[in-house]
Amino acid sequence: MNAASRSDSMKGGGRATGGRGNDTQAIEAVLAELVDAWGRGDADAYGTVFTEDATYTSFLGTLYRGRADIVASHRALFGSVLKGTRLADDIVDIRFYGPDTAVVNSHGDTYKGKPKRLTKTQTYTMVRRDGRWLIAAFQNTKRNKLMERITYLSTPAARPAAER
């Protein structure tokens, strides 16, 4: 991944497939815009990286439908519980499904000061619209490390290959 095209809180070691370097860089740039907008607490700028009909599922399970809903909710959050936070997003991989669709997996979290352990896993479904990559769907899941450890101890084959 090209670290120069991302903010310093988007340090990834992921891999893209299929020799799609320009598309990979464009997707990384969109996610850097997302991180930057979050850091500024700018809900309007945050919303510009989503499609008009995007869906957004928070780690709490809340489902937001459409850019306007995503912007309104983040405006409220940036003014309250998320005020002054920053967003860390470490890209794990980018996979392409045709010329205009990609799925991005990442680890991330919100933080104040310096980022700590990234406790959430995200999946972004990206689409190219009018030559620009945008987020069409976002899913955020909080990892439960204790339950993962218990599962892996009792069922070692359940551990993801990347973590073996």
Task: Pin down the residues of each PLM region.
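Short, surface-exposed beta-strand-loop junctions and turns on beta-sheet-rich folds
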Residues: 64, 110-111, 141-142
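Surface-exposed, charged secondary-structure patches
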Residues: 26, 55, 69-116, 164
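Well-ordered beta-strand positions in beta-sheet-rich domains
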Residues: 63, 88-91, 119-123
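Second-shell loop/turn segments in exported
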Residues: 18, 60-61
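Hydrophobic pocket/interface hotspot
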Residues: 34, 46-47, 54, 66, ...
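Short beta-strand edge/turn micro-motifs at domain boundaries
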Residues: 2-9, 119-149
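A mature extracytoplasmic/lumenal domain signature
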Residues: 60, 107-108, 139
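Short, low-complexity N-terminal intrinsically disordered segments enriched in polar/charged residues
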Residues: 1-52, 153-164
